[in-house]
UniProtKB/Swiss-Prot annotation:
One of its GO terms (molecular function) is anthranilate phosphoribosyltransferase activity. Its EC number is 2.4.2.18. Coiled coil: none annotated. This is Anthranilate phosphoribosyltransferase. Mg(2+) 2 binds at D224, E225. Anthranilate 2 binds at R166. The keyword Metal-binding applies.
Length: 332
């Protein structure tokens, strides 16, 4: 395909429309562009800052190229862009498990860590989850167990075409934002954490354009999670409406608590498991905070306070850890 007009437009600092971004993403993911062209496009967007329309165009193509999970239930996903360098445990994955134990249907989509301590796939693999889950089984587990994890490389094989270029670029690209939004089950409800405040509206606009029923984009004072250390900025998406506001731990009934951090993968796994068992208070509170937001997105609860209370109760009563064990066993 002839992308020269699009590259010229990007080189001039101009933004792409949704359709133009879709066509560029199509050329990249189908392997029709050379590495120099791909690098030029990704660099131009990264330097200028990706727009909601550009992210939406790329997500549309990514979903089109994905192996589809044939969901028959209204499911949610919890994911973050990563890259915050905060060294926290994988809260979005643990929160997804708690949300499932508390009544939400969850299709968790994730990958190994590219730069941080460990990603969602690293955690799920560490606890014995089968990462080679076929799409039909994933859909069945969401309906019956309430939780399934799908490994991004298995469901987005086209992303492999751009991997060599991404590895050579010394900065994050639009694909770091697209990945968390490209759930192969095409869920209509998501909790998305972003590492940069500027991405709150960018991701919110993309989610609105994707036709989401309800979604939250969060940035917790430097981390791509709901923070228990201080304020979290939220962009709530309902249909095509975006609303921005700030919440503090006390607003949803949580004590101000340090976020659980780890210095090794082993410690990160251990703290996440201890949090799910209610044995690590810092981890349990942070996991419950994020799970509470997920339960709000799933419409299991009416507000964040009810969500936090239900999530913490689910952890303290042992249901969260039992759900993890059940999910791991069902995946095999």
């Amino acid at each position: 395909m002839d992308v020269q007009p699009l590259l010229k437009k990007l080189g001039e600092g101009k933004t792409l429309t949704v359709d133009e971004a879709y066509r560029l993403a199509r050329g990249i993911l189908l392997g029709e562009l050379g590495e120099v062209e791909v690098a030029a496009a990704l660099t131009a967007m990264s330097v200028r800052g990706e727009t909601g329309e550009e992210v939406l165009g790329f997500v549309k193509m990514a979903r089109e190229a994905a192996v589809r999970v044939p969901l028959e239930v209204d499911a949610i996903d919890t994911a973050g862009t990563g890259g915050d360098g905060a060294g926290t445990i994988n809260l979005s994955t643990a929160a997804a498990i708690v949300a499932a134990a508390a009544g939400a249907k969850v299709l968790k989509h994730g990958n190994r860590s590219a730069s941080g301590l460990f990603g969602s796939a690293d955690f799920m693999e560490a606890v014995g989850y089968n990462l080679d889950l076929p799409p039909e089984k994933a859909a069945r587990l969401v309906a019956t167990v309430g939780f399934a994890f799908v490994f991004a490389p298995k469901y987005h094989p086209a992303f492999a075409k751009v991997a060599p270029v991404r590895r050579r670029l010394p900065f994050r690209t639009i694909f770091n934002v697209v990945g968390p939004l490209a759930n192969p089950g095409c869920v209509k409800r998501q909790l998305v954490g972003v590492a940069e405040p500027r991405l709150l509206e960018v991701v919110g606009e993309a989610l609105a354009g994707m036709g989401h029923v309800k979604a939250l984009v969060v940035h917790g004072g430097g981390v791509d999670e709901v923070s228990t250390e201080g304020p979290t900025t939220v962009v709530e998406v309902r249909g095509f409406k975006l609303e921005r506001y700030v919440v503090s731990p006390g607003d949803f009934g949580a004590p101000v608590t340090p976020l659980p951090r780890a210095r090794s993968r082993e410690e990160a796994v251990a703290r996440a498991l201890a949090g799910l068992r209610g044995e690590d208070r810092e981890a349990a509170v942070a996991i419950a905070a994020n799970a509470g937001f997920a339960l709000y997105v799933a419409d299991v609860v009416k507000d964040f306070r009810d969500g936090f209370e239900l999530a913490l109760k689910t952890i303290e009563e042992g249901a969260a850890y039992r759900k993890l064990v059940e999910a791991v066993e069902a995946s095999r």
